[in-house]
């Protein structure tokens, strides 16, 4: 029987352990075998190889099937295979066809082992598609504030740096109520609060944007920011009474009633003072506070003159102080030709507001018939004349005196600042007054037309509180909501009748409108319940439509160095710290310790430039920032090479303790800075050897006034 030779050892290793252990490979044939014997053996092995191949195929199919006994007993999933996280030392040659066909599938990289870019870029540890070495986690811009770039050193980074790509810095990226970055989760720092100015906003946009598009985006951002802020303020304070008294339709009904009663009382007192000749025309609310109580005396002169007011048209020192402190009206109001227009316009406003508040018998209102009669009697008069009949005298008001009286009446009775274009329910502070003398203004005509159009719209409009109360809208909504509560009943004697559908009410009426009236008067709880949704919507709309609503004035971000990071020369303390910690950070990254260096950088970014006399730079601004102490190493800092007094930028240098170097840079009022001789400034800040003598000549220094302040070249003389 012919000898059977097994295949080579590499194919045996790829078999199952059972097959490999059942037989051992025979020794190789001796080298003295003849070629004829080898050919005979090959011919004899051909059928055996075919049989072995077919048997191996059956065995491989059996291997793919799970073991019946083991899997039936244990249904738990197989444990995860052990993964070798070590990098392969070298690439092995490709295995033969049989090995590739039956080799196990490639395993995925272990999770959370290494971050890889999936946006058609390269890993940060390799060449970045933009050139240089890019950080591994920088898909949406800088994700750490301050410090140095995370790979291969680099220039110092700043926490306020942002990418300026095409899709970065849009107003949608900032959340309402905050003006921070769009990707705040990666920054690790609090977002800066406040509305960005236009200059700050355009720094967030791409560089190739048009000015008109930038302006449009800023207006959208500003309106969205204010709307979001007002909405949050409203949701916080909407249940408070003071806000409801200003905007809620239900509360406004009682507010309007109290306001009308108070205005009637103040108008009565004002006219009495005018007839007695003791009216004060000052810009303050001196006659009555809007609370309805007389003002308390603030000095001995006022206490002595309680009940005796200043005569009409006469002023004192205190009135002059108030006039100087009051805000000034536009310059066109001082034109003498403007007096007649203002008198007629203020009289029309007095008639309009008095009718809204139901004030009657006001001598200042005048009328068209009286105006024509006065023009006939006083042909030489330049305007309307108001006759004031007192107890013992009769006086006529015209011109500037009449205008001041009308303006004061509008302010104290109706809370209307004529020159300030403001109408409020409570007059507080000082009203606008005319400036002395005419001041030339290039935009006087435009401002004058806007001024007149503003008050003409008020004359044609309605009471602002009545508009916010929206009685007509609420009545229409109530009528629609009360339709199911109006019942139509057939009566054999009287025909059709209409009954009340409220709970427990059995009254009948001849028409449906009487049922609606009955429900609104007798069943107010039902009407209020049905119109609650409409009232709440009006409440919110009234608040949002008021441009001067509380909580609607956004706080702008601090300008100046906070707008843009200042790349100033780093302090000596930071330079020492970077030397001590930079090598350790690079070594940690080389070992794969790339997870905690970001948090250290964030801490350092808030403390760059730790000089107490220096204005620190906070990347995000705002109050309540977290200040973390700078990194301190346990290794003693090496001595610094500092130039001797009088030396140039190339030396000579002497070693100095770091404390002395930092003290010299930290104290600007101390000895002279480096590269300048001490001259008359006193002794040098170093303990020098007698071999180094000071040059008596003072080194001239020059300052380039045109050089940009942000591009400061840092010269490190330690490398020389």
UniProtKB/Swiss-Prot annotation:
Record PTM Phosphoserine, positions in chain: 76, 90, 92, 689
Zinc finger (C2H2-type): 498-523
GO molecular function: DNA binding; DNA-binding transcription factor activity; zinc ion binding
Tissues expressing this chain: Expressed in shoot meristems and in emerging organ primordia throughout development.
Extent of Basic and acidic residues compositional bias: 48-76, 116-126, 136-164, 368-378, 570-607
Composition bias type Low complexity, residue spans: 33-47
Pfam families: ARS2, SERRATE_Ars2_N
Principal location: nucleus
Subunit note: Interacts with HYL1. Interacts with RCF3, RS40 and RS41.
Function, in words: Acts as a mediator between the cap-binding complex (CBC) and both the pre-mRNA splicing and primary microRNAs (miRNAs) processing machinery. Required for proper processing of primary miRNAs to miRNAs, thereby playing a role in RNA-mediated gene silencing (RNAi) by miRNAs. Does not participate in sense post-transcriptional gene silencing. Acts as a regulator of meristem activity and adaxial leaf fate via the miRNA gene-silencing pathway by regulating the expression of PHB and by limiting the competence of shoot tissue to respond to KNOX expression.
Name of the molecule in the record: Serrate RNA effector molecule
Organism field: Arabidopsis thaliana (Mouse-ear cress)
